[in-house]
A protein has these predicted regions:
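Glycine-rich, aromatic-bearing surface loops/beta-hairpins
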Residues: 99-164
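C2/C2-like lipid-binding beta-sandwich modules
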Residues: 1-15
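Structured domain cores in non-transmembrane regions
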Residues: 13-27, 31-110
């Protein structure tokens, strides 16, 4: 199985960290691993589990690419210890892995950010359920008296290679 990391990069103003809560949904476009078929608008969450056909295992998302297919593609959402973490103000200009997807028979090729982000300011102010579907967010921190923003949100997927 392949572990693919979703990595983000953004310009932060008066923001100390950006994260997603455990169990949130990710809206993905997935591609068949050995063909050109894709599915857009696929929602996956670590809180959903489905039994795998002909196996004792479970997955957070399953898909048969054709009705008569005997093979099931699947994906598990997972945090990777010492790898996935919140994006912080110190990460300017770098892509940071925020979540991992363990995949078999499919791979994520795009992500559509939505709401649910948790944004923290240096003053201690916390905004929950922030919507980044427009790839930017602006607000005002009353504690510090400063504007706060997330701009130019970008993302990419990377295959995770465990260090030995």
């Amino acid at each position: 199985m392949v572990l693919i990391l979703l990595c983000i990069k953004a310009d932060l103003e008066n923001v100390s960290s950006v994260s997603l809560p455990p169990g949130c949904q990710y809206c993905l476009t997935v591609k068949h691993s050995s063909a050109e078929d894709t599915r857009e608008g696929v929602y996956v969450s670590s809180t959903e589990t489905h039994e795998l056909t002909g196996s004792r295992g479970t997955a957070n998302f399953t898909l048969k690419w054709t009705k008569d297919s005997k093979h099931e593609s699947y994906l598990n959402v997972q945090e990777v210890k010492n790898v996935t973490r919140p994006f912080t103000s110190e990460d300017h200009g770098k892509f940071v892995p925020i979540i991992g997807f363990e995949c078999r028979g499919l791979e994520p090729v795009d992500w559509r950010p939505e709401d649910g982000f948790i944004v923290k300011a240096p003053s201690g102010t916390v905004w929950e359920d922030v919507d980044l579907s427009e790839k930017e967010w602006v607000d005002y921190d009353e504690k510090s008296g400063e504007s706060v923003s997330i701009m130019e949100l970008e993302w990419e997927f990377r295959v995770h290679k465990e260090k030995k």
